[in-house]
């Protein structure tokens, strides 16, 4: 059994949706006495310094993201670009390889392990330096296990046709597709790590281990402790006007932006429910504010019970407020886990293939929420939005009762302190054993 204090390097994909879960894991590992060297762009370091809870053990090391001609000047992460340019950002990430190798070769003490996700070349340089590599994935095991088969069904059989616009062959770097990159990243390291637990995704984890012939190490959800930062007083005051569990909180993430017609249907669907709601969503591309695209007369009609906010909101704090009773989410992996540990009814609106698979897990396997049904072109009418929300918010609804019962069961398990600590302790032991092999 391993007992070694580890030195682990973290190099996640250049996105805050990856930096932050990697930092949450780093805090959990440092809490147990392990040393972390975390590689990330300069501006991201400045933004995340305050979330480093163990600065004596976690060192955030800034790296330079090389300029790519097709990207805006100074782009360092997905926060600086639209979704359509993520493939070009991966070119920039690949061009960090010489700097990453140089840093790894000079670190003292020498690292035992390096965690990565999208930089599929990491195992090559790690092996050369005598460092074990772990493909640590914040996406769910169901996505890792099934996404290849999902993409293979090019005729659209058994998959929603709206997902087919996300092309498996689209470039994600120079002369490499996103699918090729993912398969190399999973097939070449010493182990595969996943932010998940066996109770929820055991069958998919076993399938991944068999498919890639690699040990699969599970860290648990590694969600942070509840934040000491209070919810913005403005929103506390607004939410305080409504009954417990009555407010719909809709937050669809920053990766995919609805177009104007779809955003209007969503807004009208929220209005049709008759319930108070908080819509946090970015304006469509080409528009500076939500006011430019909301339906005519909408703001006036809902002024006493609805907020449409185009900026950032504190999602965990919003979900923890007692007035919030429904979470309409996009099923990104982090939001999925935050949803599962919340005490809200769940409505699921995935927007890209891995989110769609997460929604399958949530709605079909765990039965903790309902999916919003799309047309073949991906569209959703206001009536469908309203119907999905009402199905989980109507106190007389059998669906509402079922998803609440199932959600409570899984939530109670996931927030159990012994359960959480057991996973991180087992994960560390597995890493120690891997290093000592």
UniProtKB/Swiss-Prot annotation:
Pathway given in the UniProt record: Secondary metabolite biosynthesis; terpenoid biosynthesis
Set out the biological process GO terms recorded for this chain's protein: glycosylation; saponin biosynthetic process; triterpenoid biosynthetic process
In which domain of life is the source organism classified?
Answer: Eukaryota
Ordered alphabetically, the record's keywords are: Glycosyltransferase, Transferase
Fetch the SUPFAM superfamilies from UniProt: UDP-Glycosyltransferase/glycogen phosphorylase
* GO molecular-function term, one example from the UniProt record: UDP-glucosyltransferase activity
EC number from the UniProt entry: 2.4.1.-
Short name of one Pfam family for this protein?
UDPGT
Q: Which residues form the active site?
A: 18, 117
Q: How is it used?
A: Soapwort saponins possess anticancer properties and are also being explored as enhancers for endosomal escape in targeted tumor therapies. They may also serve as precursors for vaccine adjuvants.
Which residues of this UniProt protein bind UDP? 254, 312-313, 330, 335, 338
Q: In which tissues is it expressed?
A: Mainly expressed in flowers, flower buds and young leaves, and, to a lesser extent, in old leaves, stems and roots.
Return the similarity comment: Belongs to the UDP-glycosyltransferase family.
What role is this protein assigned?
Answer: Component of the oleanane-type triterpene saponins (e.g. saponarioside A and saponarioside B) biosynthetic pathway, leading to the production of natural products with detergent properties used as traditional sources of soap.
What name has this protein been given in UniProt?
UDP-glucosyl transferase 79L3
Species the sequence originates in: Saponaria officinalis
- Gene that specifies this protein: UGT79L3
């Amino acid at each position: 059994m391993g007992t070694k204090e580890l030195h682990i390097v973290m190099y996640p994909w250049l996105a805050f949706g990856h930096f932050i879960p990697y930092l949450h894991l780093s805090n959990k590992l440092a809490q147990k006495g392990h040393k972390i060297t975390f590689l990330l762009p300069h501006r991201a370091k400045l933004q995340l310094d305050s979330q480093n809870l163990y600065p004596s053990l976690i060192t955030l090391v800034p790296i330079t993201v090389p300029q790519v001609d097709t990207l805006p000047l100074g782009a360092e992460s997905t926060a600086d670009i639209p979704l359509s340019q993520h493939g070009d950002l991966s070119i920039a990430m690949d061009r960090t390889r010489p700097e990453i190798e140089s840093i790894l070769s000079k670190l003292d003490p020498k690292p035992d392990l390096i965690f990565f996700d999208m930089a599929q070349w990491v195992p090559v340089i790690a092996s050369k330096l005598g460092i074990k590599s772990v493909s640590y994935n914040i996406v769910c095991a169901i996505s890792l296990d099934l996404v290849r088969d999902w993409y293979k069904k090019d005729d659209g059989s058994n998959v929603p046709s709206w997902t087919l616009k996300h092309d498996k062959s689209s470039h994600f770097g120079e002369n490499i597709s996103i699918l090729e990159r993912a398969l190399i990243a999973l097939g070449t390291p010493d182990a595969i790590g996943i932010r998940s637990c066996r109770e929820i995704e055991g069958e998919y984890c076993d399938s991944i281990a068999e498919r890639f012939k690699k040990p699969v190490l599970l860290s648990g959800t590694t969600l942070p402790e509840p934040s000491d930062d209070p919810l913005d007083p403005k929103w506390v005051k607004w939410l305080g006007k409504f009954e417990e569990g009555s407010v719909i909180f809709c937050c669809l993430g920053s990766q995919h932006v609805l177009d104007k017609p779809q955003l209007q249907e969503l807004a009208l669907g929220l209005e049709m429910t008759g319930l108070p709601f908080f819509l946090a969503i970015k304006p469509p591309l080409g528009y500076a504010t939500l006011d430019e695209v909301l339906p005519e007369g909408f703001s006036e009609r809902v002024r006493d019970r609805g907020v449409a906010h185009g900026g950032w909101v504190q999602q965990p704090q919003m979900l923890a407020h007692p007035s919030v009773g429904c979470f309409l989410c996009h099923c990104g992996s982090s939001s999925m886990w935050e949803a599962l540990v919340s005490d809200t009814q769940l409505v699921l609106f995935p927007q890209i293939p891995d989110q769609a698979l997460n929604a399958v897990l949530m709605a079909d396997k765990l039965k903790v929420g309902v999916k919003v049904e799309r047309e073949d072109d991906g569209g959703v009418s206001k009536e469908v939005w309203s119907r999905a929300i009402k199905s989980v918010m109507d106190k007389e609804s059998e669906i509402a009762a079922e998803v609440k019962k199932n959600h409570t069961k899984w939530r109670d398990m996931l927030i159990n302190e012994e359960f959480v600590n057991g996973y991180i302790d087992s994960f560390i032991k597995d890493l120690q054993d891997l290093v000592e092999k």
